[in-house]
Amino acid sequence: MGRPNVLIIKTNGNLGRRNPNTDAVLGKVMSAPAIEGGMQNGIVYPLASINDAIAIGITAAYDLANTLLAYHHINRFFTRNPNATLYLITAPQSASLADMTNITGVYVPVLLRAMAGKVKYVGVARNPAVGYVPVLAGGADSDVAAAVANAQALYDAEFAQFRYAGFLIEGRSFNGTAAAATDLRTLGCPNVSITWIADPAISGANALYNGYAAVGDTLGLISLAAVSQDAGELTPAFNLQNKGLGLFLTAGLSSNLSVNSYSDADLDMLNDKGYIFPDVTAGIDGFYISDSHTCSAIGNNDYAYIENNRTIEKAIFLARSAILPLVKSRLKADPNTGLLLPQVCKSIEATGNRSLGGMLTDGDISGGIDTYVDPNQNVLSTSQLLIQITFVPVSIGRQITISIGFSNPLKTS
């Protein structure tokens, strides 16, 4: 214990300094009425914390006055990951999910172009006006399916421009029947996911919120996960429930029903159909994202889960950034054959291998980085240089089987 004295404990981490991460730069697009002297529709706003949203007029009082969940979604996002950066653009309240994701529109496309590839993932949510009645199709608001198709078309167009950002769509107004639900695994949209998660404390706060889905919470947890990590990993950081903050004391779906209202068979069916919902695991307290499904088949598909896409997109970005200085550069050829000199090929291969070294260090890939430049390609004639890069990804243990039983040391046969 020592002699009586005044002891000093120097604390750290109290200044709220952020730990920025370029993987955790996300976008949020949602319908919400413009604010006089504050947030305007169609303008991109950078948000480093909920205080930046408050500064442009998006407050809890704004939500209450307009019967919407704009502040709520942003606040939940930063509650899940205070170190993330969120770029926000809003549309008029009349805009649908399909409108916001339209490839010729002025919302998601404008955000992605304005950020020039910095935004890595985008959440899209709808705050319908009072009186809105969804048209149900395939077990949900028909607007959801239309937005999924639009988002995939937009992803493909953006990919061609070297901007890589996947999509999370708000799965509004699930009709509560697993059998009637569309099989999302048949939609052929590997870069789009839908969240059907809902916090019943929010769903039940107003009739207009009955069909909402927790885009803010889900997007925040995706941003918190490493690119190779399932955002439903069963570790405390990814627990939807936070009793201290009153988050997800219970859990439900956008059907306005508790997850406990569904049988195990129903939940298994929804999981097999690619639905993201709050799951309960025996032996672990709280609720976790069921899985990181995309709207695409599992078989013969490398991109059936969100982390598959985030990993390959980061690898593409890093490799391209490393190789870009070679564009229009001089590549020496053998004066006798006209083919690239061996040392030129080896130098390019070393550059490609180094580009993914950080991902190996961070644990986002397993290794096996291999860059290959065919020494027999005729760059003199074609002006085209072909480079192949491969690596071994990390695996996710979705089904773990344990064989366990008694042993008897006296048993001889």
Model-derived regions: residue spans:
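Short, hydrophobic/π-rich interface segment
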Residues: 342-366
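Catalytic cores of large soluble enzymes that bind and process phosphate-bearing ligands
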Residues: 66, 139-146, 307, 336, ...
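Long, contiguous, structured domain-core segments that constitute the functional module of a protein
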Residues: 225-344, 391-413
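Small-residue-rich
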Residues: 1-186
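Short glycine-rich, low-complexity/disordered patches
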Residues: 164-166, 172-174, 361-374
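Compositionally biased, low-complexity/repeat regions
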Residues: 86, 91, 97-98, 366, ...
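Conserved, well-structured core segments that form the ligand-binding/active-site neighborhood
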Residues: 120-265
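Anaerobic metallocofactor- and corrinoid-dependent redox/one-carbon enzyme cores
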Residues: 1-33, 250-274, 383, 387-389
